[in-house]
Amino acid sequence: LEANNEVAILVFPSKRFKLAHLIAALNARFNMNAKVPDHMTVPSHSTHDALEDERNQHIKIYVNGDIVPRDQAKVSVYDSGFMLGDGMWEGMRLYNGKWAFFDEHMDRLFNSCKAVSLDIGMDRAGILTALSATAAANDMSHDVHCRLMITRGTKVKPFQHPVLSQSGPTIVIIMEHSKPATSLQASGIRLATVPQVRGLPMSQDAKFNSHSKLNCVIACLQAEQAGADEGLMLDPHGFVNTTNACNFFIVRNGEVWTSTGDYCMNGVTRQKVIDLCRANDIPVHEKNYSLYEAYGAEEAFLTGTFGAQTPVATIDGKRIGDHDGLGPVSRRIRQLYADLVAENTA
């Protein structure tokens, strides 16, 4: 393959490597050298773009029972999370002094920790107490984003074996004043299909919300190098799956499509959107579908705890619909979800 007098040799280790993966590899390889369309010559964005808030420079952070100023919050260089990415985390939103969908987030956290034999060292009530204490120390009650992180703890030697983690878990809670930037609701996110895929469960199950995010970081880097904001990741069979940070939906002929869920993160917001569609007579399907079908969607959006529903304006430079991914179905879902959050945190 030749482009701009450069020769790229692509080596595929398996005959099962699908055409969709080849398309993704070509997008990431050559989009850096292609002329960027006018509608893509804008600064890079993220689904986690938030309004700047000076108060976040002075937050207090929970570290193993202590609540300390931001610049004093530290964990050991021997910590399992730092050394190996051995830990789980949850992202949650605080509205009106209540955590949105707290039980669902705890279900995911405790199930994940149980699956990897990580003893949290406290029950749900204990976690809620720690969250409440951290929020109170920061005088926070609304439009707050929390990252709750739990690792296997400090090791006695810098090696992999879990038996070397003998101190008990490390628990960190970071809360920030964090209101999503409204500009993305108008402009939408730009996606690029990337070579990096969400793997099979026998490698590392994508349902784990783990500290080991290198796979997704690589996907994000590939997307940025292709001139996009986030990477659209395929599953091992070449079907559209998820992005590096969020779950992915399209709308075709009034129907909502998302992946089967076999290879994507077990998203709380994703499931809420599916449930809302079913409860409000919006046709919704968890199914395999191709890039061909994604390119031809009338609407597309991402779901996540922080951004709720973020429209997708382009995929691989191709405009989605006539309004940067927005449309009547996604607007209705956004309102239904906002109403559900308000009800859950009333």
Label every PLM stretch briefly:
Residues 26, 30-232, 236-239, 265, ...:
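Conserved alpha/beta cores of soluble small-molecule-handling proteins
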Residues 269-271:
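Secondary-structure junction motif
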Residues 239-260:
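Glycine- and Gly-Pro-enriched alpha-helical subdomains that act as flexible
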